[in-house]
Structure formats: structure tokens, C-alpha cells
Amino acid sequence: MAEVMESVSTAVVPNSSVDWQKRCIALETQLMRFRLQAGNIRHLLAERMQELEQRVIEADQRAESAEKQVHIMEEKLKSANMQPSETENSLYRSYQELSNQIQEKDLIVKRLEGQLEKQNLVRAQEAEIIEEKAAKIKDWVTFKLREMETENQQLKKANLKQTEQILMLQDKLQTLLERPMSPAVDTHLVPSSPLHPPSCPGTPPAQEDCWRLPGCRLNSSADSKRKITEGCDSAFHSASLLPMLQDKADSPKSSQDGVDATSTVKESAEGVEPSFGVMRDRAMGGASDRDHSSDELNSKFRSQCLRSSSSSSSSSSSAYETPGPGGFDTPTPTPKSPPPVSLSPPLTRLPLSCPFPLALPLGTSMTLPKVRTPLTPRDSIQLVKKHHSQPQPGLERLHQVNVSIDIGNCGSPSCHSLVPGSAPSHGLEETDIDEGTPESMEVVVEGSEITEAQPNDGDLLDGLTKELEMMDPEALKPPTPPLHRFPSWESRIYAVAKLGMRVSEACLGAKTIGRVSTQPQHSTTGPFTHLIYKNISVPVYSTLKGKATQISSVPLPDDDSGSEDDSSSLASLHTSTLGPDKKGSTPGSPRAVKRGVSTSSISSESDYAIPPDAYSLDSDCSEPEHKVQRTSSYSCESVGPETLEKTGYLLKMGSQVKAWKRRWFILRNGEILYYKSPSDVIRKPQGQMELNSSCHIARGEGAQTFQLITEKKTFYLAADSPNILEDWIRVLQNVLKVQASGPISMDKEVKPTARGWLTKVKHGHSKLVWCALIGKVFYYYRNQEDKFPLGQLRVREARVEEVDRSCDSDEDYEAGGRGFLSSHFTLVVHPKEQSPTYLLVGTKQEKDTWLYHLTVAAGSSASLRVGTEFEQLIGKLLDVDGVSDSALWKREVLCFSKEGLRYPLTTLPSEALQTEAIKLFKSCQLFINVLVESPSIDYHTSLAQNALQVCLTHPELQNEMYCQLIKQTNCRTPHNYALTQCWQLLSLCVALFLPQHHFLWYLRQYLQRNADPRTEVGKYAVYCQRSVERTLQNGEREAKPSRMEILSILLRNPYHHSLPFSIPVHFMNNTYEVVGFDGSTTVEEFLNTVNQRTGMRKPQISGFALFTDDPSGKDLEHCLQPANKICDVISKWEQALKELHPGKYEGTRTVRLTYKSRLCFRAQAKGETERERLLLAYQVNDEVLQGHFPVSKELALEVAALMAQVEYGDLDRAAMSPVGSPQPKTQQTLLQVLERFYPKRYKQECSVEQLRELGERLVATKWSVLRGCTASECVRIYLTVARKWPLFGAKLFNAKPLPPSSLDRTQVWLAVNEDGLSVLDYTMYPLVTYPYQSVITFGGCKEDFMLVVSLIKDQALGKKTVDKLLFAMAKPKILELTLLIASYINYWTSSLPGASNQTQSSTLGAQGDKKLWDIDSRHFPSMTYTTKGPTLL
């Protein structure tokens, strides 16, 4: 067929134009399309058919369900049609029940409405009755008031009569006193002063016996008791009616003052005359008309007083009887005293209980403190009951004068009435209900004896109470308290607090002075103490212009400087700001002018005169001082002539008593002479200082003190202004040939790049010197310990070369007998425009080291081939500015190599350090190549700590450490755990120290190249960059990393946290706050974070500080200064713990940080936050618990209940059993309360049963009353009670006075607060207080604490004496006490208006801009490296 088709196609091709092949292809294409369309149609049709089938199935299912529902409905319909009656019955029953309930409710409502109407009627009737009673009471009150007014008029008339009688009695008394006395009687009339009563030491025995009076009994005991009762009764009803009447016979103006005296006596005689009448009637045995009238007046007065609601006067006078010389009794009024003189807190302890004489001679006055008169007798009854039931008043009466008034005659025992004086205000005073009321009716015996009441006091009080109750039964009813008063329980707490600021008598009686358990013993110093306190170097401070300025960083020896007498005149600079001292200037003798001394020099003897530094003996120095430019650095190579002589005033620290003395100094011929004044220059000098080559100068703290250190002594000197100080230092440096000032060489933070002994040759002169290259300056010293250089050489842009001395013939030249040939190698340093200096070096290693570092300092390292190959490549990178595409980065020397190091990568000055560098590389390899796992974590910790400690001990290896770690991480493949651990070790390094000079630049460039937040290595590089900046900002660390820091780096990814470390900060209320920090965080930054989280103020305002516990576990705490770094503190703490427990280190125990109050300022109390008040209350409670706060047993229970309410809230009443004893759970809570809030000394001698009774008493009378009181209210009340102690907020230190101290005590307390330093006895009674205005010098003196104070001996003449006090204490406590006093003094100095001006005027005033708390930071953690050679691993 195909053949036929071909033949046909061939036959017709020429005759036809149709292309059948294309036609066929087109048809086949159409066929394919048709097939596709047919397939699609079949597919769509199948889908449609499936959809229709599905619908059919669903329709069938719905039909079936509909049929089922139809069947169900049909069945229901059939059942409903079959039972219609049952449904109707159930509905009918429900209807009946609801109807019955409605009827019952209606009946109840009607019954209640009836009862309501009855109640309304009863209320209306009661209201009418009440109105009638109120009207009757109003009428009765009106009637009584009229009656009282009438009686008052009558009493005024009676007062006029009594006034006349008193005047008559005064005339009689004057007549008796003017008569000549016998010697026996004359001893009774010795004039006395209220400040020195006969009970005080020094009173004649005859006079002291007359005070006592119990010795002579002339009347019967019954009569005496009657007289005492009546006298006390009248005095008690008018507690403020003290003997204040003016003796008219003594005054020439009696006629003019008669009206005033009459008006005064009118008010006062109401409470005075009743006792007169009764006492005269019983004493004389007869009665006159005047006596009968007195009795009638007495009875009326009693009835009037017992029914009145207010006293008729606030100030009155009382009279009493004294035995006259004739044997009969004569009523003697007390003359009125002049206005009372305010008594400031004494500097010496005065007896507070001093009974006054029965009769005062003419010309003497007696000043008594005033008290508030009780409003009603029932108030007096309750006061008597309350004060008689409370503990006896003791030594807590700190700033008050307690007076005992004897009322009676020779035949009666004394009746004592304690009248409190007005205490001075101490900050925020809280007003309470008992303010001004008599606190006790007992005698307070001062001294070391225990307070005991007189035998008859209880009987007198009981008799007085019963007598008042019998006279007026209504007096037992308590009056309604006014609305403005505190709640009863709060008033009770304040009342107890007024008598409870003391140690209870039971506790004092059981202990002697020598064994008081509340005083801590001297603590021994442990390893952590030595680390944190720089080996306990106690500084010495002096008060200059009101500011505590450090004059020495070490304790002073006993006899340090000077030879003149210490009793000479003192400088008054320390009182110029804090106190208004007398500033008189007395010109010198006129003869001084004739001797050639200028008038300006003589007039400068004034305290604040500028010394005549312009009057130098050098005639060239005639330029005025204010035109001379002052600089802080000096050079011997100056063009002008050097000033080698000077005169002027300086302040000099005394030798025995460390006080400032103003002396006239003359510097001439290489020695210093000093005199008392310029007029004494013709006399023998008071002292002399020889200046030689071994002398040097050391600046003190601030800008006004310096030390002149000679071979034998150290002289402490101060100037009146910073400019004068700079002039003296300049001249002294010229004399001592010192060419550089102290700041650069004395800066311990700047580490020398290279140092060692070299022979310096210049201008043909050679000298063996100790050299140090610091930065770009080359310094040379006499010896290694010298702090001031002999000279300096600026190396920057200098030409440094090695001199070829192979042809020299003096190879055997030896230098200084030091055993090495210094002529082997020679270096020349040729600065621009200066002559060259030659350095002779002994060994090749030293030569290479000095050549490299000098070349780097000169800035020409790239052009010369010095240093190792690694250092040369870094120099080349520095020249090309470290471009990232430079081929130098991939040089084999800078990249990772599997082979170990054979030589150090940096230039090191000795063979030992080179060996140490190789061992350091091996240690790093062990750390890097061993995988960090839990079992081997301590292994890696030890490796890292040892390696980094070697770098801290030898700073020369720090550059080497960084070069090795960068080499180990650069171009290292593959990226495994070894690379990560190498970056972790680098992360530990950058937080501790940084490389120097161009190595630091290389580190920064390397970190920048690798910083990439997308990779793990890049994240570590970013973290290291942040650490480098933080280390540059806050300075380098002092201790190796702690275990906690290393574990945080190894186990936690530090790059995920901005603060990779965290530690809990504990508070006094047993709570804590977890705070984060990094490797460079200081305590100040750390506390800012704590304050933000807890809502507290800055430490400079609140007075809070951070403390650490002691690793030994002893009850010791160490205060951290703001400049300390948290990581250093933790590391030193762990190091001390390892030393205390060698071989068994507990990794679980960590340092405990506590945030609590260190300084307390009354002025800052107003802005206290709730959190601060809460923490302060818990801190005071801790002091109460430890026995550092005086509380009685009663007050201890009160404050314990307050703290229990704060800690546990309301006491659960359901927990109390019906009998009244607590259940076991409550009993356990009470034991916890007593354990946490009740003083330990009161629990020591208590048995278990006594503790249980104490807990029941706490619940029944104290804690249960506080129900509903919030924690903030309890804290407020607690602090109000605590602030009633005048020394609230003071820090107490246990000390032992040493001779020549006047304190004859074995142990005392030293209390430091914002007012000054107080010395307390073992009962915390103040013996003496030294305000900061009187403090001259304080700090360490040998092994003890020294305090030098200036006291005013004679107030009238203004004479001052200087006392030096020594106290034996533990060294850490001496340092803490010294820094605490300095902080308080400088706080007040900074708050004064002129303080800022003084700081700004200083040429070195930058140091004064530091915060107050930073001033003593250098005494805290700082490692001192004393190792001479390398410390091998």
C-alpha cells in the first residue's frame, strides 16, 4: 500500500500544488488535539458523574433519617394521646405547692414590718431621753462652771493673803540669815552651784551630810510620813510649780516688781500653801487663826483640784520648811531663779542626779528644768501607776539633768521627785503622748552602780495613789482621749521607749566590766583581711580647713618629728570651716622691723595670712606672686637661676601630740630652721632639718600637705594655699636636685615597659642608676626604691643606635662593683637638639630588650630591624595602618602552627622570663587542647588561674600572652573545640589586663577583623571588643579570675549577655536581689544597678554601702569602696578561702555580698524610701540582737513585737488554744521571733520554761495589740523609737584605752556618728563626746588607734588644750574606724557653701572632684608584687 501511495504521490506532484505531507501532519495534529479534548471531556464527565452519585447517596441518607424522625414523632404522638391525664395531675400539684409558699412568705413579711415599727418607736423614745439628759448635763456643766468661777475668785483673794504671809516669812528668813552663825550651823549654808551639788565629788563632808537628812530624826515617824505625803501630794499636783519665786529682800526693786510678784504668787499659792498649813500644824503642835484658814483653804483646794478638768496655771512655786538655828521650823520659800542657761552636751561625764540644798544663801540661784503639769489628778494617778510598774530608769538619761527635790524637815526622810530636763533635738523628733510628763518618782544613781529606788519611794507612791482615790472615786475613770493623740498601744510603746534606752538592771548586775558578753573581742586578721586591706596599712588623717586630709598612708611612729614643746600654740586651720573660731592676729614685736624683718612677714602671723613667699632672700625673685606662672613640673635644666632659699609660714605636725603648729620656716644653706614667729629668729631655733642626698619629698593627699623624709625622721608639713605649697616644693626640689615632679613617677597605674640597672654616661661623667622606661620617657633613679627620679630623657623622635665598641681597649671596665662588665654593649640615645646620652649594658639579652623598647618609644621601629620577627611584622602592619587585604596578616609567623614555640614571640629582658614564656605557652596548650567537660572543669580552672597569675606577677609577660593567643587563633583550621577554648582564654585575659603600646593596637585590629555576629568565633571577638573598651574605661584588674568567672566563661556563652556574670546581693531582711556585672564592673556601677532595681537612693545620699563576709566564717564584714572591682573582690575572697582550707576547697561556697547602711545622716532621713526604712529597721534590729543598741527588757519585747508584725503579719487567733497557751505551730513561730528579734544577752540565762512564758507574754500583751497594723506603720514606729537614742545610726567599736588616757576603763565603746566620736562605757552610757570640730588628727599610731583633739580648757579666756588619746583595737577595726571618721568629716565639708570654691581654687583640684567615697579607695584591694624572680608553674 505504501508503494501505491508513493507512486500516486509521485504521479500527481507535478500536477498538484498541495503538500500532502504537511497536510497529514496538520491532520494528525488536529487529531491529537481532538483526542486531548475528548480525554478532558471524559475526565470532566467522570467527575460530574461522581459528584452526582455522591449527591444521590447523601439524598438517600437524608431520606432515611427523615423517615426515622417521622416514625419517632408518630410514636410520641401515640404515647401522648394514650396518657393525657397523668401530665395534668403533675402540673396541678406543682401549682398548689407554689401557692402555699407564697402565703407563708406574706406572713413573714407582715411580721417583720410589725417588728420594724416597734423598733422605730423605741428609737424615738430613746432619742427623746438622750436629748433630755444632754440638756440636764449642759445645765449642770454651766452651773458648775459658774460655781468654779466663784470659787476661783475666792481663791484669788486667798492668794493675796498668802502672798502677804510669804513676804513676812521672807523677811523673817532674811533676819535669820543675817544673824551670826555658829560653825556647826555655818557648814549647812555653804554656797552651792547647781552644776556642782554636794553629791558630786569635791563637796565638803559636812555639807554633803546636810544634803542627806535621813540621819537626824526630830519628830515621830508618823508625823514625818504625813508631812512627806502632803508635800509630795502638793508637788505632784503641780509638777511644774517648782521653787521659782524671787527673794524680795535680796532685790532693791522689790517695790517696783511687787505687782508681778503678786500675780505670780496668786497662781502659784494654790498648790503650795496647803502643805504649809498641815506641816506647821504638825510641827509646832498648836494652831492659830492663820493655820485654821490654811486648813480650810487646803480642803477647798483639794476638792477643787480633784474635780477640775484643767489646771489654773502652768508655772507656780512651792515652799518647804527648813530647820532654823533655834530649833523651830520656819517656812522657807525658794527664791525665783533667773532664766535657765542652756547646757550643751558635755565633754566630760557629769552626774545627772544631784539633789538641791534645802536652803540657799543670798546671791545663789537654782535653775530647774520645767515639766508639763498634769491636766487632772486622774492623769497623775495613771502616771504614777505606769511609771511605778515599769523598769527603773537607769543610765539612758543621756542629755538630761535629773534633779531630786527634798521636801520636809530634818526629822523626815527625803521625798524625791525626778524631773526630766529638755533633751536637745537630734534630728527628726517624734512627738508622743508622754512628752514632757514626769517619767519616774525615783532617784537615779549615776556612775557604774545599778539604779535602785529609795526604800520609801514605793510606800509614798502607794499612799499618794490611795489618798487620791479615796478623795475622788471618779478619778479611777479614764478620760476620753482626744482625737489628735496616738492610739493607746502606740503611746505605750513611746512611753516605754523613753525609759527603755538602756541595758536592763538584771543584765548589768549579772556581769562585770571585765566580762561583758555583748562586746566583741579583738578579731584576728585572716588572709582575706590582708588581701582586702593591703596588709592592714592604716592611714593617718588630719583636719585641715574642715576637711579630713590624709597626711600619711602608714601609721605614725610614737615620736616622729620635731623637737619643740608640744604645749606651744596650735594652728586653727581645722576649725576655719566647721566652727567659728577666733581669728585674731597679733602683730609681732616692733623690734623685728629694726632687725630687718619686713612688716608683711610679721603681719602674716594671722591664721589665714599668705606667707611672704615673695620676700625670698634671693634678690632676683622680686616679681609678685600672682604674676608668676605656676606649673606642676620643674626641671633643673631651666635657663634662669635656681631659687635655693625661702622663708615663710608653714604648718608642722607635732612630735608627741599629733597637732598642727604654725611655725616660721627659713630655708638657707641646705638646711631648714623653724621658729615660733619671725621675731624669734635671733633666738635659738625650735628645730632644724638637714637636707642631703638621701632626703626626698612625698606629696600628701589633696593640694596642701607634703612630707619631707630625711634619714632620721619624717616631717609632715602643710601650707595655707596650694600656690604656697608648690613654691616650697619647687625650692626644695631645687635644693635636692630633683628634676621631675611626682605625679608621673608616683602613678602606680602606669607600668614601666623596661627597667633595670644601667650605667649612664653623659659629658664624660658615668653613674650607675636604676632606669625605667615609662611611655615615651626614660627615667633614672638613685636606687630601685626611690620614688623621685634624678632626671628624665624624652625618647620620642630620638635616634636610638647601638655603638660598635669592638675596637675599644677598656673592656675590663667594671661598674660599681656589681659584678658585671657594663662596657660590653653600648646604646646611644640622641634626642633632637640635645646632647647624646650613652647607656652601658652588661648582657646581650638586656641590650636587645633596651634597644627594642627604646626604639619603639622613639617611633622608629619600622625603619630599623630590632626586636623579634613577630614584633617586626607588627611594626610593618602599623606602618601600613593594618589594611585588611595586606599579605602581612597571613605571614607564617603570625598564623597558627602545630609546632611548639622554641623562642618567645616578644623581647624579654632576662633568661628566666624567656623560660617562663615557653612554659606559659605549654600551659595555654594544655588548656586549649583538652576538651572542657564536667569532670575536668577544675583542671581547666586551675590552668587558667595559674597562667594569668604569672602574667599579673610579671607584667613583662602580658604582651607575650596576647601574642601567643592571637597566633593560636589566627587562620586556625579546622574550627573545632580547641579554637573555641582559645577564644575563651582570650576572653578571660581582656578583662584582667591589656597589652602595651603597639600590641594593643594589634589586638584591636585583630578583633575588628574577626568580629562577626553570625559565627561563634565572631561573637567571641565582639565580646572581647566590649571587654577591651570596658578595661580601658575602668582600669586593669588586680587579682586573677575567680572560679565563678572562669566557669561563667566556659559553661555559659558570654557573648549572649551584656553582663555575663551574676551574683545575689543580700539585704538585712533576709531577701536578696540577683545582679549582673562584667569583668570591669566597679562597686559604684554595681550599686547603681542595685538601687535602680530596689528603688533606693544613691549611696552618697542614703549612706548605704556594700559589704562582704569573711572567708573564715567569723562574724566579720569588710566594706567595699566604690573604686573596687567586683571580680577582684570575689577572686581574693576565694583565694583566702583556699588558704584557710588547703586541700579541701569547697566550690559550692561563694562570697556573700550584703547591702546595708554605713553612714547615717539626720538631714537625709526626710527623703528615705520605703525600702530604705525597712532595711534600716532590720539593721537596727540586728544591732539590738547583738547588744550594740541599748534597750531594756520591756522595750526589747515591744520592738520584737513590732518586727514580728513586720515579718509575719497578724497573729493567728485561731492558733491559740482555749486555755490561752499557744499551739505547737504558734509556739514554734514565737521561738523564731525571740531568736531573731530579742536580744541574746537577755536570753542567755533564761530556761526553756522562762522562754515559753516570755513568748506567751509577747503574744498576750504586745503582738496581739498590733493586729491590723501594716508593715510600713510598724517600721515607722520602730524607727521613731530607735531615733530616741541620741546615738542612733552610730557605729560601735570595742576598744581599750591606753595610757596616758584619762579614761580609767578596761573596755569602752567608741561610737562614730555624724556629730562626732563618743566614748561609751560598757553600759553604753556616754562618758565623753568629741565633736569633729575639735578633732585634729586621727588614724594609726604604731599598733593602736590615735585621736588628737583640741579642748577648750577655760571658756572665758578661750584657752585650748590638746589631748592625745590611744585605744587598743584590732587592725581591721582601726582602719574601718579611721575611714568612717574621714567620711563623716568630708561629708559635712562638701555640704558647706564654701567647700566648692576651695576645691576649684586648687591647682591640683582635680583630686578634689572625686566623690567622697572614693577618697579612701586605695586602702582596699590591691595586690603588691614582691617577687624578684619569675614564679614558675
Swiss-Prot record:
Residues 332-343 have a biased composition (Pro residues). Residues 1061-1392 form the FERM domain. Residues 247-346, 552-634 are annotated as: Disordered. Residues 557-567 have a biased composition (Acidic residues). InterPro entries: Band_41_domain, FERM/acyl-CoA-bd_prot_sf, FERM_2, FERM_central, FERM_domain, MyTH4_dom, MyTH4_dom_sf, PH-like_dom_sf. Residues 896-1050 form the MyTH4 domain. Keywords: Coiled coil, Developmental protein, Repeat. The keyword Metal-binding does not apply. GO terms for cellular component: cytoskeleton. One of its GO terms (biological process) is branching involved in blood vessel morphogenesis. Residues 40-174 form a coiled coil. Residues 308-318, 568-578 have a biased composition (Low complexity). Residues 252-266, 597-606 have a biased composition (Polar residues). It holds the Pfam family PH. The keyword Repeat applies. Residues 643-737, 751-859 form the PH domain. Transmembrane segments: none annotated. Residues 279-299 have a biased composition (Basic and acidic residues). Critical component of the guidance pathway underlying endothelial cell migration and blood vessel patterning. Involved in mediating membrane localization of ephrin proteins, which have been shown to provide guidance cues for endothelial cell migration. PANTHER family: PLECKSTRIN HOMOLOGY DOMAIN-CONTAINING FAMILY H MEMBER 1, PLEKHH PROTEIN. This is Pleckstrin homology domain-containing family H member 1. The lineage of its organism: Eukaryota, Metazoa, Chordata, Craniata, Vertebrata. The gene is plekhh1.
